[in-house]
Amino acid sequence: MKLLAIDSSILTNTSVSRQLTRSFVSRWQKIYPETEVVYRDLHAQPINHLSQKILAANSVPSTQISAEIREEMNLSMQLISELLSASVLVIGAPMYNFSIPSQLKSWIDRIVIAGKTFKYVDGKVQGLATGKRAYILSSRGGFYNAEPALNLDHQERYLTSILNFIGISDITFIRAEGVNVGEEIRTQSLHQAEAKIQQLLQFQMA
């Protein structure tokens, strides 16, 4: 079994989402010690945003592609391979300005590729990254799980939509909300998220 773990927070020691991904992966490995973990830190090793040159490279002769762009194309194929070969996807995704970090968006733009992770059949989209479970470790400074703030959530809704689009429908969100409201709420929210991780993985063992 292969697990692909991704961190996207620009914070390091104080990151809530990183704390949760570490906890999740550590607990998972104790249950499934044979798991091969592939880890990507999108802040420490950022992926360049998709550019016109990278996009156009798929439709020009290879002799016309520069070494720099060829390296970018190879990276895209590596990212897609990491995703498709994984049975489990774990993403640390903090909410930034009601959405996701640009670092995570760069990764998404590299793996959502026609003919690789989705295709069109009779005019309808068919995801090709099927048979996977996704766990999203979500952190939010405020509370966005109820009206009226619910309408400001372009983080979890977007991630659900894009993963569904490429064929991943088994998605579980584990969130820590209100982490910037106050220290007491932050601690309580983290404890609740950790408890949910433990509960989920205990259920996996049953």
From Swiss-Prot:
Paired cysteines (S-S): none
Keyword Lyase tagged: no
Pfam families: Flavodoxin_2
InterPro entries: Flavodoxin_fold (IPR003680), Flavoprotein-like_sf (IPR029039), FMN-dep_NADH:Q_OxRdtase_AzoR1 (IPR050104), NADH:quinone_OxRdtase_FMN_depd (IPR023048)
Key words, A-Z: Flavoprotein, FMN, NAD, Oxidoreductase
Reactions performed catalytically: 2 a quinone + NADH + H(+) = 2 a 1,4-benzosemiquinone + NAD(+); N,N-dimethyl-1,4-phenylenediamine + anthranilate + 2 NAD(+) = 2-(4-dimethylaminophenyl)diazenylbenzoate + 2 NADH + 2 H(+)
SUPFAM superfamilies in alphabetical order: Flavoproteins
GO molecular function: electron transfer activity; FMN binding; oxidoreductase activity, acting on NAD(P)H as acceptor; oxidoreductase activity, acting on NAD(P)H, quinone or similar compound as acceptor
Annotated residues for binding of FMN: S9, S15, V16, S17, M95, Y96, N97, F98, S139, R140, G141, G142
EC number: 1.6.5.-, 1.7.1.17
Keyword NAD attached: yes
Co-factor: note: Binds 1 FMN per subunit.
Similarity field: Belongs to the azoreductase type 1 family.
Oligomer and partners: Homodimer.
Function (record text): Quinone reductase that provides resistance to thiol-specific stress caused by electrophilic quinones. Also exhibits azoreductase activity. Catalyzes the reductive cleavage of the azo bond in aromatic azo compounds to the corresponding amines.
Protein's UniProt name: FMN-dependent NADH:quinone oxidoreductase
Native species: Legionella pneumophila subsp. pneumophila (strain Philadelphia 1 / ATCC 33152 / DSM 7513)
